[in-house]
A protein has these predicted regions:
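Hydrophobic alpha-helical transmembrane segments
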Residues: 16-21, 60-64, 87, 113-117, ...
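Helix-boundary and loop/linker segments of multi-pass membrane transporters
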Residues: 10-12, 37, 108, 148-155
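Alpha-helical transmembrane segments of multipass membrane proteins
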Residues: 26-29, 93, 97, 122-130, ...
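Alpha-helical membrane segments and adjacent membrane-interface helices in multi-pass membrane proteins
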Residues: 30-97
Length: 216
């Protein structure tokens, strides 16, 4: 991911501020958690939006940095779970969502619809990956009595709980992704080279509002 982003930065220096904005957005919106059954939580990520704007490898790097900051500064997600969280939200989500976006954009010629379903399907795919990782733990990790050491819930519980919860939270992710995509379209921006501070002012104000509203 770092190598791919370095090539992109060498080609276009304006990728750096966009990458910073994307990382900030991802960090902030992930702070708004909704409780889900079984001690888990659901939240938007922004990974597909970053993938659409800068590419999936850039999204992988940005979301990984955001997750690391959350784990180290706030204990959110946990350091020991960083690898699993990064795999689900910084690898599965941006690459699946970006693939859906590209496919639908080719079929429909409508980037707003494509970005909505890219964000929606991307976060559902990430949630189902989490469900599988949690659901196989009772099989893999047991004590001498056969009791689960960590997560006690099997796949028949984790899959529907995480899946159904994120079918709802996925709407937030989809609308967020499509909304920012529409914002960029209305500015008649075809690529990141045309992004200026003046044009991005509403987005920067949105980030400031998220900072103020972020629960600490």
């Amino acid at each position: 991911a770092v190598k791919e982003v370095k090539v992109k930065v060498d080609t276009d220096k304006k990728t750096i501020p966009m990458l910073g904005i994307g990382t900030s957005l991802s960090f902030l919106i992930m702070m708004f958690n909704l409780p889900a059954p079984g001690g888990t939580s659901a939240h938007a990520v922004g990974a597909v939006l970053i993938a659409i704007l800068l590419g999936p490898w850039a999204s992988c790097l940005a979301v990984s940095v955001a997750l690391a900051m959350q784990a180290l500064l706030f204990g959110d997600g946990g350091i020991l779970a960083f690898g699993a969280n990064a795999f689900c939200m910084a690898v599965v989500m941006p690459f699946v969502g970006y693939a859906v976006y590209k496919l639908l954009n080719k079929w429909t010629k409508n980037r707003i619809i494509a970005s909505f379903f890219g964000g929606y399907i991307g976060i559902v795919a990430a949630a189902l990956t989490v469900a599988v990782l949690l659901g196989i733990q009772p099989i893999l990790f047991k004590d001498s009595s056969g009791n689960p050491l960590y997560n006690p819930y099997p796949l028949r519980v984790t899959l529907p709980v995480m899946g159904l919860t994120h079918l709802l939270i996925g709407l937030v992710e989809g609308f967020f992704t499509a909304g920012v995509q529409e914002f960029i379209e209305r500015l008649n921006i075809d690529n990141t080279q045309e992004l200026t501070t003046k044009k991005l002012r509403p987005l920067l104000l949105f980030i400031l509002a998220l900072i103020i509203l972020t629960p600490l």
